[in-house]
Amino acid sequence: MKTLYSLRRFYPVETLFNGTLALAGRDQETTGFAWWAGNARLINLSGKLLGAHVAHAGLIVFWAGAMNLFEVAHFVPEKPMYEQGLILLPHLATLGWGVGPGGEVIDTFPYFVSGVLHLISSAVLGFGGIYHALLGPETLEESFPFFGYVWKDRNKMTTILGIHLILLGLGAFLLVFKALYFGGVYDTWAPGGGDVRKITNLTLSPSILFGYLLKSPFGGEGWIVSVDDLEDIIGGHVWLGSICILGGIWHILTKPFAWARRALVWSGEAYLSYSLAALSVFGFIACCFVWFNNTAYPSEFYGPTGPEASQAQAFTFLVRDQRLGANVGSAQGPTGLGKYLMRSPTGEVIFGGETMRFWDLRAPWLEPLRGPNGLDLSRLKKDIQPWQERRSAEYMTHAPLGSLNSVGGVATEINAVNYVSPRSWLATSHFVLGFFLFVGHLWHAGRARAAAAGFEKGIDRDFEPALSMTPLN
């Protein structure tokens, strides 16, 4: 089949009345889009669009490198990461770089190296972006047919999809190799309060790993967010990487089935909408993961989860009052329930008081005190270790609550500290970004479907107030 790259189609979108402004030689008349429509002007210019994407990647990687070095420059080893407003160093520490037992930072040089590598990479990407945006060929189809494409060429589109899937699969395997062979990763569950270790006994059982996908998202079930051991996380990445690579090969070798050709819209804007929907889902899942999961996001680096801080408070006061002579097994609280300990709906012994709602929390500082029926009274009396007391007291005062002005903790607490948890920032930002990506998906999906149906006209601007106003210039 002859490639269709010469068939230029411009959607008749009506835009602002000032169509004279031209950027990089592409104005509204020749492209059908005004300057503020950004990459829409490049829909049919694959070379220029490549430049825009490479330059965008350069900006992303530059931010990563610069922010990384900024965090290294401001890092104080004596304070926990989550007290310092860090969001990048906790990720590097979770990968096992620069940390030792208990999550203590013993070497910041790997963090410096990471920042420099990202800055160098961003320079390469930035040069490539400028080259392709300004100097390279406008279209790739004639000179480099392998990299050229036509949005309507379904076979080429699924080939590109396949290449992307293979790259994602290789990315998943990078984590696997780091955990298995290159120094290991940080395991918050390692005995005695967490340590870096190599993963030796991968979970590859499909019933276990795909069982997470079949769990309820509610309560103590928690869907995939409930994963709480590294063997499952790394084993899951083996499966994900394999599925992505095999799926990528399949998409490269095959053509779309007839039902897919009929059901999907095959245009650049449609692909944009699909991508935005996927990123939106990723954002919402990441939000839940960083908020609730203390295995993939260890509390040593990100601060405690909300339930963890609450349970830590109950534990701290249980320890204090038990030392003062209270019988924590039988003391009654103001509601008639147990003051320190009570029973869950399913019969386990749990912490009493307001924290009862978080009874299904699992945390490495607390699990050693559980028996077959929940919290074990004899262990609470005899086996509490100093590191558990220290950690729970620390977590109690660093709950992931807080306002934009950084006055953290409970709003009514007179001893509030100048602290906002990275969990708050990361969960909130990913929720907000996930929401806006979803709105972008709806917007572009609607436009793509309308264009495919043949009635895309843009917004009718005949009665727009701006038309009757004096131009600003």
UniProtKB/Swiss-Prot annotation:
Sites of Phosphothreonine modification: 15
Any one cellular-component term (Gene Ontology): chloroplast thylakoid membrane
BP-aspect Gene Ontology terms: photosynthetic electron transport in photosystem II
One MF annotation (Gene Ontology) recorded for this entry: electron transporter, transferring electrons within the cyclic electron transport pathway of photosynthesis activity
Residues annotated as transmembrane: 69-93, 134-155, 178-200, 255-275, 291-312, 447-471
Record's cofactor remark: Binds multiple chlorophylls and provides some of the ligands for the Ca-4Mn-5O cluster of the oxygen-evolving complex. It may also provide a ligand for a Cl- that is required for oxygen evolution. PSII binds additional chlorophylls, carotenoids and specific lipids.
N-acetylthreonine: residues bearing it: 15
Membrane topology: Multi-pass membrane protein
Chloroplast recorded as keyword: yes
Keyword Chloroplast included in the entry's annotation: yes
Propeptide residue range(s): 1-14
SUPFAM superfamilies: Photosystem II antenna protein-like
Keywords: Acetylation, Chlorophyll, Chloroplast, Chromophore, Manganese, Membrane, Metal-binding, Phosphoprotein, Photosynthesis, Photosystem II, Plastid, Thylakoid, Transmembrane, Transmembrane helix
Pfam families according to UniProt: PSII
UniProt-annotated binding residues for [CaMn4O5] cluster: 367
UniProt xrefs under InterPro entries: PS_antenna-like, PS_II_antenna-like_sf, PSII_PsbC, PSII_PsbC_sf
Protein location: Plastid, Chloroplast thylakoid membrane
Quaternary structure (record): PSII is composed of 1 copy each of membrane proteins PsbA, PsbB, PsbC, PsbD, PsbE, PsbF, PsbH, PsbI, PsbJ, PsbK, PsbL, PsbM, PsbT, PsbX, PsbY, PsbZ, Psb30/Ycf12, at least 3 peripheral proteins of the oxygen-evolving complex and a large number of cofactors. It forms dimeric complexes.
Function per UniProt: One of the components of the core complex of photosystem II (PSII). It binds chlorophyll and helps catalyze the primary light-induced photochemical processes of PSII. PSII is a light-driven water:plastoquinone oxidoreductase, using light energy to abstract electrons from H(2)O, generating O(2) and a proton gradient subsequently used for ATP formation.
Entry similarity comment: Belongs to the PsbB/PsbC family. PsbC subfamily.
Protein name stated in the entry: Photosystem II CP43 reaction center protein
Organism the protein comes from: Oenothera argillicola
Lineage of source species: Eukaryota, Viridiplantae, Streptophyta, Embryophyta, Tracheophyta
